[in-house]
UniProtKB/Swiss-Prot annotation:
Residues 112-352 form the Lon N-terminal domain. HAMAP family: lonm_euk. It is an enzyme of class 3 (hydrolase). It is found in: Mitochondrion matrix. One of its GO terms (molecular function) is ATP hydrolysis activity. Belongs to the peptidase S16 family. ATP binds at residues 507-514. This is Lon protease homolog, mitochondrial. It comes from Ostreococcus lucimarinus (strain CCE9901). Homohexamer or homoheptamer. Organized in a ring with a central cavity. The active site is at 838, 881. Pfam families: AAA, Lon_C, Lon_lid, LON_substr_bdg. Residues 1-40 form a transit peptide.
Amino acid sequence: MYATRAIARRLERHAARCKGAHVARAVRGARARTTSAPRALLDALGAGRGDADAFGTRTRRTRNAFVSSVDGDGSTGSTGSSSSSSSSAFGDSASSGGIMVSASHPSSHPQVLAVPLPRRPLMPGIIMPVKVTDEKLIAELEDMRNRGQAYVGAFLQRTDAASSASKGEGEDVFDALSAMKRTTTSVGLDGEEMVDEDEVDPADHMHDIGTFAQVHNIVRLPTDSTTGEESATLLLLGHRRLRKLGTMKRDPMVVKVEHLKDEKFDANDDIIKATTNEVVATIKDLLKTNPLHKETLQYFAQNFNDFQDPPKLADLGASMCSADDAQLQHVLELLSVKERLDATLELLKKEVEIGKLQADIGKKVEEKISGDQRRYFLMEQLKSIKKELGMERDDKTALIEKFTKRFEPKRASVPEDTAKVIDEELQKLGGLEPSSSEFNVTRNYLEWLTSLPWGVCGDEKLDISHAQEVLDSDHYGLEDVKDRILEFIAVGQLLGTTQGKIITMVGPPGVGKTSIGQSIAKALGRKFYRFSVGGMSDVAEIKGHRRTYVGAMPGKLIQCLKSTGVCNPVVLIDEIDKLGRGYQGDPASALLELLDPEQNGTFLDHYLDVPVDLSKVLFVCTANVLDTIPGPLLDRMEVVRLSGYITDEKVQIARTYLEKAAREKSGLSDVDASITDAAMGKLIGDYCREAGVRNLQKHLEKVYRKIALKVARAKSADEKLDSIVVDVDDLVDYVGQPPFATDRIYDVTPPGVVTGLAWTAMGGSTLYIECTAIDSGDGKGALKTTGQLGDVMKESSTIAHTFTRGFLELKDPGNKYLADTSLHVHVPAGATPKDGPSAGITITTSLLSLAMNKPVKPNLAMTGELTLTGRVLPIGGVKEKTIAARRSGVKTIIFPEGNKKDYDELSEDIREGLDAHFVSTYDEVYRQALDWEASS
């Protein structure tokens, strides 16, 4: 048995802590009888003490200490020529062995006490601490040691048994050995009584091949305060291999064994010499990645001259590896020296690769950490130097100077109360610690206050001709909006200054409401800012949050001023008819102050809490309908209605704007591709009938994408395309079947059917009123309505029925049809909700047509509200209804007299080909619709 000075010192310190006097004496004795490793050998391996720092600081703890017995049991085989092999590997290195501490032990021991090892097997020549928790086993080991026969058999448990035994594993008390990553194992033998022969042999849970080991020392540990369990730590020294033959005793377990010897080998064999040299070289590489393995190498060099023993070298190499238990057990079971060297070499190669990878990872981490630390220290030094030289001030001083520098040029235009607030906040910021939460709140507040454009107005162009040119180049039509903007510019020219206005554009989707807002800003030369309030339900989006809240911010209007940098931008508030309302407040009510010209000069944001002048801002709002806008808010707006486009207007828009953009998006700028006028008309009439042009834009892009696909395929096939023309017959191939059929259900309307006109979000459409009898001659005279009619339209039906019965008596005194017959009035397209009073004269005409069995005048459509006395009242949507009439092929239309002015304002393109009649009483309607033959 041998021990080095290093491990002896560690054991001595541990023994002193455990107050084990006999252990301390034994360790001191071992220490006195040890010596250092041969210098020449260590220098050859690069493991001399002077090279301790040559491999970096990234290390791993070694697992064991290598020792040797002096019994000379012949396990090394033939070693006659090993010196030459070693010399070739390491050169002519002189070695002087240390003073050997011998422990006499029998060369043959047929029965041994079995010590199961839950994890690592014990290699011959290896020292391993083992924790024992079985009191009977501890007592037996102490008794054997007192008799001088402390020899045991150490067997690795099989996997299932090892996992079970390790559950009670305690802490390793040998700090020195634990620091070198030696395995501490736990053994818990239940000390069960002898059982029948048929019972399973507990020794079967251990591998058959183990290690004959000497118990060098036993140290009692303090009793576990939790379980009351007593335990001790053994120090086992492996000597040679043995095979378990059977169980002799079970309490504690004694097994019959056979001591094994290595197979004979020729040390001069070239393969063994080469493998030995490679093992030594690999150990040398391993020392470079893990310098702490040098201690293990020193122990080996003390006891074996110049690595002349290949079997021991193989065991040493295996003990230095962190392989799993099965691989190490395989090395232990190999009796062939050549096979053992090969297996050890494979494990060492893997260990070297793991060490290199670990070293690389460690190096990268250390470089990053050291680089960050170096950069941090340099930055701190730089700050200190600049501060001493007066080149840099602290963050708080720099912030105050920044805010002051930003605010002073605006002080003259900032209101006095606001300037006072800013000065107070600057003074407050100077007295706050940068680490306090109030410091950040004050800093953010000053950031907003000093960033606003107090009194800073952007340049604007009050040039009517320039504005007209810009508006016409961006949009076709929309004359009402353009005229209103030109009026705004004209007033500004005459007054020399402009005031803020609130203009609301109402119209169906896709007519250009949003885009015209940007064109207005371009025409005026002002900054543009847009935000949508559709679905907004939090009033803080308009008025801002209180500064007491975490993450508080001003509202959208204050953000707009900071973003644009001027106090007179054009602000587009999109989808104002879709404002929400929730528990956070009512944004529509918050807009009352914002959109009131009398109040927005002192708009108060919750975050800023100082008045802000918004009177120079031009607000442009957009909406699809006015019904959902609250009355007080609508009262503050100047409404401009945008109607849908007729077919001719859509053609012009498509040719002038949309088609060119679609070609460029599809990459067809240099390709000869076009759509014929007939195809364009059909595309608009049968595919894109909505009031706007957004759907038309999508269809044009789809057509040109199909053309782009054809061009790309032709280029791939090296085919030449002269030109591509899309005609009417090609539309199905490009955009599919038309979704809209003709509006006309009847070519010739029968009695009881009349064509009406309706306004929809799509612009306008024709609406058929159908009436038929369900019962006759029973005197009921009831009326039933269907077609998903709203309450107002149902009331119009009732009024029409009542009025028609009296009117029929005047025109046809003997006709009792309406009095005796139950009627059913239906409005087709039953899935579409319908409401409004404008179908009054249409329903009345339908009832009279059925009662008198007379069809209405061909190609006639009408709209108007009817009273009980027969008066016809004005309705809305004249332009949309007129467009719908033209699209359906109507030639004659009837409007209320009150809508004559609206009709006269329509362009000639819309009125062309229509014969309009304006009526004030139903009698005039009757003459045009049912008595037209007599009047003509």
